[in-house]
Amino acid sequence: MADRLVRATAAGGGIRLVAVSTTETLREAQARHGLSLLTAVMLGRAMSAGLMLASSMKVRHGRVNLRLGSDGPIKGLMVDAGRDGTVRGYVGEPALELDPISDEKGNYGFNFKAAAGTGYLHVMRDDGKGEPFNSTVELVGGAIGEDVASYLLHSEQTPSGVFVGEKINRDGILCSGGLLVQILPKAAEEPALVELIEQRCREIEGFSERLAACNNNLEDLLIDVFPDLDPQPLTDTEATQDVRFKCRCTRERSIGALLLLGRKELSEMLEADGQAELTCHFCNNRYVVEREELIGIIEGLPAAV
């Protein structure tokens, strides 16, 4: 079943809602990068969050980058998400595994804080017009949802609830997705509504179970979570859209990256390896430039480069 994103409003238009499923997207990322369940879950949460942030951009080609920079053993992660529903990403230490931890109810889960360590969440919004908007906030706990909510509050001054989750078993990813709840500016002036939304967000428990139960029907998920706020999917043509893993790397771009190395370094590479090999961080695609082609590239460069 294809992943999708749904935009909606609630409380008479005072609340903005975005729900996204990223199950197939995450499965592809896991297969491409050889991710452990821990790193797959963390990357999946970041991809869901990135897509939900990108969904509010005005231009179709707008993109959002989320980068977790920290001192933890995961060695950071990076997500590039587009308003068009495409997303890609990678993890610094894809095979990382840590012992699970238990909560007060005896349920076991991943130790996101230990994986992430201390550090920062860097967010970049790029609409293709002028300089991208960049902002950085300290990590709250490394589970992604709270970290992105902190960014929205402190950098965009938008009170938000960000819920990301997944269901897994020993065989892999059963479902993955997220939910974004934002109080729009006019509604933020109504204390009773703000208090109601904050209460509803505090009451959301078992988001991952609710996500799995909706079986990719995100409209049902919105009604399940906010039954008394009358969530209404937008009626325009982009109220819903497909979501997929897609990388923008190409062989031509890889050749362009080789040119930046210069004649001397490429000549040393030719002598040592007989070819050049580049691997895309985002999708793990491998591009090989064979000996004859590499010689042609070197001969086309000025000697001083």
UniProtKB/Swiss-Prot annotation:
Superkingdom, natural source: Bacteria
CDD domains: Hsp33
Predominant location category: cytoplasm
Keyword presence, Cytoplasm: yes
SUPFAM superfamilies: Hsp33 domain (SSF64397), HSP33 redox switch-like (SSF118352)
Localization per Swiss-Prot or TrEMBL: Cytoplasm
GO molecular function, one term: protein folding chaperone
Listed Pfam families: HSP33
Record PTM text: Under oxidizing conditions two disulfide bonds are formed involving the reactive cysteines. Under reducing conditions zinc is bound to the reactive cysteines and the protein is inactive.
Coiled-coil residue windows: none
Disulphides: C247-C249, C280-C283
Gene Ontology annotations of biological process type: protein refolding
Manganese as UniProt keyword: no
Alphabetized UniProt keyword annotations: Chaperone, Cytoplasm, Disulfide bond, Redox-active center, Zinc
Gene Ontology CC terms, in alphabetical order: cytoplasm
Family annotation (InterPro entries): Heat_shock_Hsp33, Heat_shock_Hsp33_C, Heat_shock_Hsp33_N
Function: Redox regulated molecular chaperone. Protects both thermally unfolding and oxidatively damaged proteins from irreversible aggregation. Plays an important role in the bacterial defense system toward oxidative stress.
NCBIfam families in alphabetical order: PRK00114.1
Family indicated by similarity: Belongs to the HSP33 family.
The protein's name: 33 kDa chaperonin
